[in-house]
Amino acid sequence: MVLVLDFGSQYTRLIARRLRELRAFSLILPGDAPLEEVLKHRPQALILSGGPRSVFDPDAPRPDPRLFSSGLPLLGICYGMQLLAQELGGRVERAGRAEYGKALLTRHEGPLFRGLEGEVQVWMSHQDAVTAPPPGWRVVAETEENPVAAIASPDGRAYGVQFHPEVAHTPKGMQILENFLELAGAKRDWTPEHVLEELLREVRERAGKDRVLLAVSGGVDSSTLALLLAKAGVDHLAVFVDHGLLRLGEREEVEGALRALGVNLLVVDAKERFLKALKGVEDPEEKRKIIGREFVAAFSQVARERGPFRFLAQGTLYPDVIESAGGHGAAKIKSHHNVGGLPEDLEFELLEPFRLLFKDEVRELALLLGLPDTLRLRHPFPGPGLAVRVLGEVTEERLEILRRADDIFTSLLREWGLYEKVAQALAVLTPVRSVGVAGDERKYGYVLALRAVTTEDFMTADWARLPLEFLDEAARRITRRVPEIGRVVYDLTSKPPATIEWE
C-alpha cells in the first residue's frame, strides 16, 4: 500500500493510477492528514504530490511534520519536494524564472534512476526551487536550468524530484516510480485477478442471501457490476430502463450480452413516458432534471413491485469518492444523473464494490468477467442519453436522425481503427438549419457537429486530431445516408474552456 498525500495537484489521481499500473495498491489522502490517519492505513511508502501553491504562502497546505521522522519511505514531487526540503532544513527560494515544460536531466545518479542512461527528458512545472538540499542529503539530478532537480536522503529511503514522473511527458517516469517502489519494498500484488478475487469475496460476505437491486445503463461500470453479482452468485435484479434516448441498437446489444452471461436482467420500456415529459423542453438543465426524475420514478416502481431488496448496488468509482470527500467547494458544471433521490420509503444499504477502483481497472475486470469488447471498450455515454446531444427540444424524429448519424460516425471510427485511439466520440444534432443543394434545388438541412477528444482522466481533454481524409469521408457518408442533415462540422474546442458534451 502506497499513500499519496494530495496538495492540490492536477496530477494527483494520475500518480495513484500510475502506481496501480505498476501493481502497487494506492490511496489518496488530504495533504494535511495527521500521522495517526496515515498510519491507520499501514502504508509501505508515502508520496507527496505537487500543488499550485508556494511554500512561502502563509496558508499553503502542509503535511504533518511528524511524517518526516516516521521512518516511512518518502517521495516528494515538485511542491512535495519543496515541502520536504523546507521542513528538513534545506533551502527553497522563489525562482527568478519559472520552469515549465520539457527539460533534460543532464546528470542523474543513484538507485532512483537505475536503468536510465544518458540525458533523460522530464516535465517541469514550478516557480519556487530547492537551491540546497537538507543537511546530509545529496543532489542526485540536475538540468541546465536547475542544479537541484532531485535529492536523496542519507539512508536512501527518501527522495525529492522537482519534475513530474507521473506524466506522459516524462517518458521514463514509470521506471523512476518503479525504482522507488522497489526501494520502498512495496507489495506489487494489485493484479486484476487479485482484485476480482477480493471483490467476489466481499460481495458474497456482504450480501449473503439478501437480495440486491441495481440499475444498468449499458456502460462499462454498471455492466461489469451486474456481471460481478452474477459471478458471485448473489440474488440480484439488474434493471435496464429504456428511456428512448439510447443509441442505435443499444438496447438489444446490452440485453443480449448480459443475459448470455447469466445476469438476471429486467428491461423496462419507458420510452413513451420520457418523451412525453420532455415535450416542449429546450433548456439542458431542465432536460437533465426531468430525465433524472422520470428515471427515479420508473426505477422505484420496479423496486416496489419486485421487492423487497436489502441492497442497492452502484458502480461508484474511486474518483467519485475522492470528489465527495474533497471538502473543497467546486462550481456545479452539470447536474449529474444517478440513482440518487430515491423516495424515503425505499431504504437500501449501499453496495459499492468499485468504490476504490479507477475506470481502467473496471475495464480490466470486465475483460476477466467476459464482457464483450463492444461494451467493455465503449466510450462514456451520459445518463440522459441522446437528450443532451439533441440540442433544443427532444422529439422522436430528431432522435432518429441523430441515431443514424451517430452510428455512421462510430462505425467509421472503427473501420479506420480510430475508435480506441480517442477517449470519447459523439455526434450532436444542432437546432440550426443550413442551406444546401440537392440536385438542382436548394434545401435546408440540420447542421450536425462531430466531436472526438483524447484525455487521461476526463478532467481535461484535447480535441482529437482525426485525419482530414477521415472527416471528409464522415461528412460525405452522413449527408448521403441521412438526407435530413445538410452540413457537418467538427468541434475543435478543448476542455477547458468547453466541456466534452455540448449540453
Swiss-Prot record:
The keyword Ligase applies. It comes from the Bacteria. The active site is at C78 (nucleophile), H164, E166. ATP binds at S217, G218, G219, V220, D221, S222, S223. One of its GO terms (cellular component) is cytosol. Residues 190-378 form the GMPS ATP-PPase domain. Its EC number is 6.3.5.2. Pathway: Purine metabolism; GMP biosynthesis; GMP from XMP (L-Gln route): step 1/1. It is an enzyme of class 6 (ligase). This is GMP synthase [glutamine-hydrolyzing]. It comes from Thermus thermophilus (strain ATCC BAA-163 / DSM 7039 / HB27). The lineage of its organism: Bacteria, Thermotogati, Deinococcota, Deinococci, Thermales. The gene is guaA.
